[in-house]
Amino acid sequence: MLKEVEAVRYDRKMRNGKTTPFLMACEKETGDEVELVAKFSKGCEDHCGGLICEAISAALAKDLGLPIPCPYVVNISPEFIATVAEPADRMFLEQSCSKGFGSERLPDSYSTWVSPSGKISDSLLASARSVIAFDSLFVNPDRRAENPNLMFNGRQIAVIDHEMALRQDMILFWKAPWTSGAFESPSSLEKHLLYRITKGSVLSDFNEFLQKLAMITDARIEEYASAIPID
C-alpha cells in the first residue's frame, strides 16, 4: 500500500513531464532514504484530483502485478520548501498541496519505450498484455506514441504517469470496456502504444491478470482510499 515519506533533499526539475515532476530524496519511517520522481498538485490539470487518480491507479497496478515503480505519498514541509534554491521551483511547491505523489526512480538503464524489432520474449509479452488490459479497464488514455509513459531497458517495461486514469468523464463518447462497441470510440484500443505487439491475443492470455483482478475485494479498494491523505 502507499507509504508516506518526507522530502529531505531537492535535486532538480526533471527534463520531461507535463506535470513538472521533480527529482528528490525522501526519508522513510525507517530512516532510510529513497530517490523519487515526485509530482505535485500545481502541475496537474485537475490539481489534487490528478494526484488522487495517480495514487489509486498505482496501488491497483501493484496489486495486479504490473511493472510499476514503487509508489509513495510525499510530504513537503515549509522547512523543506525553503531549502529549494531555484525561486520558480520553490514557488511551484509553495502553491501545491502539502502532499504529492512519488515514484521510485528507475535505474538509468531504462529509457522511453521503443518497440523491439526482433522476437518479443514471453515475459515481455505477458507484461504488455497486463498493461493494455489495465489501461482499457481503468480508463487510461495516456499511453500512446506521442506520449508513451512507458519505460524499457531492453528486457523489461515499467509503467509511469497515471493521473489521467479513472477519468472516463474526460473522454468523449466513452463506453465501458465490457460493452459492445467500446473500442470503436475515439479512445480506441488500436491507438494504444502496445496494441501492435499484443494484437492477436485471446481471452485465455489474460487469465493471470483476471485472476489477480478477482482477488481485489471491496475492502481492498477501501484501503486504497484510506491511504490517500485527507489534507
Where are these regions (language model features)?
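Conserved ATP-binding subdomain of kinase catalytic cores across diverse folds
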Residues: 1-114, 137-141, 154-155, 162
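A short, terminal or domain-edge coil/loop segment
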Residues: 19-21, 121-134, 195-206
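Short, structured coil/loop segments at alpha-helix boundaries
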Residues: 82-89, 93, 117-125, 186-187, ...
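A general structural signal for short secondary-structure boundary/capping elements
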Residues: 69-71, 145-150, 204-208
